[in-house]
Every structure is written in structure tokens, then in C-alpha cells.
């Protein structure tokens, strides 16, 4: 095993794990499920299925410098220019035949409105089975039972499509892995608050993936363990004059101007992204579906914009950030809509 040196070494290995997962889904679409970033994937990992998600696909394609071809193809077919870039790229990949038909398409009503539109279009295009998990705006026991039953129903559909039953022991194992990963991420955040590290936008996206689509998979847990090891050896934050930046929303790792500012000019370092910390609640492996449901319901991206803003401010303070960047683009109406409120709250 290669010896760890800094956070970038952990990023590199996680990038490899994400790329292998995406390639596995492209090679074996009959064992892949297209999901949005908020969909619990522990039951997929337990069934040996690969989650394919627009954010990962689009970043992977952006590294090949051909994402514009797919975005333009989607626009020609009627997708608005102002639609989410991640989902627009994914739709263009599907309409050009590059993205094969998956076993199932599954999304949630949480936060991202683009996934409900693009996933329905994908399901009609292939055609492919579509499941949408309805996430209420409250988190009481009735809501937990309601969402848990939907997740069980999705699992039954997957069992019918694959001809294989879910192994409950494997699901509990995946849930235990997920619980450890979230606990480790909380531990890493406490360490990260006091040290300085060389960071990249792609690396922060890796952290987001580790606490979402690869949550419950060994790759996600191993990545966070590596982050902890590098943070323990990192210099104290007082040893640098770089500004510590906390990022709200996904990071545009393809944008040269942002790369220069946040990576190459050595003026700033990223200390975190709000989406990584949107739901770090403890999980009960003995109640897997209820735990997945509760994580969806307590996610700060559900409900009012104030929940997300309050959570971002709290984590920015915990991580000793000097400033916050809220990345707005046409595609994410929720993030763009909360920008003025967030600016006012951050400047108070």
C-alpha cells in the first residue's frame, strides 16, 4: 500500500475508487441504478449494485474535456440552457447512446428539483423502471415509517428486477459501515478545524460522495480514515496565512478561474463543503430502513432555506473558516434562491 503523504494522496485514491465505480456501472448497466446524490445507497451496496449519479458522471466526463458535446446535445433536444449542468450532461450522454440503460432509475423529492425532471425524462427515453421516494417536510415517527416503507418497496422492485433477494446480514453490514463513516467524518472535521492542508475542489467532492452515494461502501469509509491520518500529521493552522474557505453547494472543479484561486495560487484552502455535512446522524444497523429514512428526513436540504444556512454557518464556525463562498448557477434554483438570505445571515 502506498504511504500516505497529505490530503491529496487520499483524494487521488478516492478519485480512483469513484472512477472504478462509474466504469463498472457503464460496463454492467444491468447491475447499475441511476440515483440522485441524496438517495440512500446502502441497500444497493448490499445487493452488489452500482449507484450511478449525475454529479459523478458529469465530473468524470469533464475530465475528458468532452462534456460540452453532451450538454449541447441535450440543449438541441429541448433541455434549457439554464438547466443543471450535471443533469444536462447526463441527459446528453443518454441521448447520444453513451450512457446505457440502467437496471432502475431512482430519485427523491429532497432538495434537487432537476432530478425529478431529468429522471422522468430518462425513464421515458430508455424506457426503464422509475422510483421516486417522497420525502415529507417533517421528521416525526409517521414520516419515518412512511419513507422506510417506500425504501422497502424500492428494494422489492430491485429484487424482482435482479431475481435475487436482499441479504439482510449484508444490509446490516453496509449500515454499520455507513455509521462508522459518518462518525469518522465528524472526527475528521474536529481535526481539520485546527490544521492546514493542501486541498482541491475535486477532493472536497470526494468527501461529498463518501457521505452520500458511497456511504455504506468500504471505499467511502477507507477514504475518511485516510483523511484522518493525514490531518493528524498536518501542520497547525496558525503556520499559514492562507484564507480558510467553506463552500456552499457543489464545487465547480472544471472552472479554471476557481482552480487558480482555490488551488494553484496558494492564497486559500478549502476546509469543507456544506453538502458533505448535511446529515451526519448516527445510524442503527438493526433498523436499516428506518435509519435511511431518518437520514433523509433530517437532511438540512429539506424544508426551509434557513435550515441549510444555519447548518452551513455552524460548520463554517466549527472548521474555523475565514470566509464562505456560495456558488450560484442557473441550474440549482434552490441554491440561487437562498443566496440573498444566506449573504445577509453570513454578514450579521
Placement of each model-derived feature along the sequence:
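Conserved acidic residues
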Residues: 31, 102-103, 322
